[in-house]
Amino acid sequence: MVNEQIIDISGPLKGEIEVPGDKSMTHRAIMLASLAEGVSTIYKPLLGEDCRRTMDIFRLLGVEIKEDDEKLVVTSPGYQSFNTPHQVLYTGNSGTTTRLLAGLLSGLGIESVLSGDVSIGKRPMDRVLRPLKLMDANIEGIEDNYTPLIIKPSVIKGINYQMEVASAQVKSAILFASLFSKEPTIIKELDVSRNHTETMFKHFNIPIEAEGLSINTTPEAIRYIKPADFHVPGDISSAAFFIVAALITPGSDVTIHNVGINPTRSGIIDIVEKMGGNIQLFNQTTGAEPTASIRIQYTPMLQPITIEGELVPKAIDELPVIALLCTQAVGTSTIKDAEELKVKETNRIDTTADMLNLLGFELQPTNDGLIIYPSEFKTNATVDSLTDHRIGMMLAVASLLSSEPVKIKQFDAVNVSFPGFLPKLKLLENEG
């Protein structure tokens, strides 16, 4: 990774932008389009490094995926005609690719090996392996917990599973495996987690029932799959950096168009509203994956907040930049119930606190979250993304609170989810 990026951006931020397509939905659209025999077109996909790993794996399985002017054209022979890969399936830095394909390839019964980069090699896989083994998947990891994951053919059975954590990746791994079982699967969630797999199964004609915290699948549901075109909304996790940047930078007025506001993902909007932030939604669309334009204006005197319970999974990927936002509130804020942050690209509880504390902010990590005190940017230490894309972008937003440039090591980690992040931030500076 490039060693160092100097961030020298000052406010106010003004203008109108779009953010890249939603990462979660792009992954799932590629997977489902690849399973369905025929041609599917995916419009405005995210073509960051994570989603490219998913594309490359399906190309090895025999799917043709063409990139053409902000769209992907996926031409698939259908899941029954997939090749057996003769090389390791490399998932890079992508936890979504690794965990969802663990379920999908187990269901398909394709002999394969999934392995990622050094960061993925440290991330626990037992939470996925346990339910898959209950489904009779023949899948093994190092110490039953780490990549590489070795998958061999087996006959998947349906299960009745009580989720141990509120994790969309674990839920989705089970759902993808269940497509191939002769029995129904019932999943009971602890809290509502992002439901893109469920909404997109329906979009590709796969029957699934979800009510409250219960999800029921249909036996051998894969036989119903049909190719479909899909328009990917802008990623609210990417929009979050601009939402916070506008809220904390005096004089700012930013509008972000075509952002996905699925209610299982829109926790940051709820949090900003509770803090008294100046945020407005308009141009709203309805449907399985609703969208809106979001206007954000600088807001002094933000109110402190406690983020806990069902709000946490709705904002899990945004919590590092939300923690930065909370430093600008008029009182102490708390994030609880966020143990899931420990198993992201880094332990985001620790990395968020460590990097922001280096810059003079005051955050105290806890076992399941953070205590965040009203505090200011005080010192121009060199900070480090630690190869975590969301930490890198959060630190770039923090630099707006400094009058001096800020150096961030390993900044090109942001390309995982947001190629072109820095030029877009500079565009708003120039318009301001």
Swiss-Prot record:
PROSITE patterns: EPSP_SYNTHASE_1, EPSP_SYNTHASE_2. The active site is at D317 (proton acceptor). Pathway: Metabolic intermediate biosynthesis; chorismate biosynthesis; chorismate from D-erythrose 4-phosphate and phosphoenolpyruvate: step 6/7. Keywords: Amino-acid biosynthesis, Aromatic amino acid biosynthesis, Cytoplasm, Transferase. It holds the Pfam family EPSP_synthase. The keyword Cytoplasm applies. One of its GO terms (cellular component) is cytoplasm. It comes from the Bacteria. GO terms for molecular function: 3-phosphoshikimate 1-carboxyvinyltransferase activity. It is found in: Cytoplasm. Phosphoenolpyruvate binds at K23, G95, R123, Q169, R348, R390. The keyword Cytoplasm applies. Its EC number is 2.5.1.19. It is an enzyme of class 2 (transferase). 3-phosphoshikimate binds at K23, S24, R28, S167, Q169, D317, K344. One of its GO terms (biological process) is aromatic amino acid family biosynthetic process. CDD domains: EPSP_synthase (cd01556). It catalyses: 3-phosphoshikimate + phosphoenolpyruvate = 5-O-(1-carboxyvinyl)-3-phosphoshikimate + phosphate. Catalyzes the transfer of the enolpyruvyl moiety of phosphoenolpyruvate (PEP) to the 5-hydroxyl of shikimate-3-phosphate (S3P) to produce enolpyruvyl shikimate-3-phosphate and inorganic phosphate. PANTHER family: AROM/DEHYDROQUINATE SYNTHASE, PENTAFUNCTIONAL AROM POLYPEPTIDE. Monomer. Belongs to the EPSP synthase family. This is 3-phosphoshikimate 1-carboxyvinyltransferase. The lineage of its organism: Bacteria, Bacillati, Bacillota, Bacilli, Bacillales.
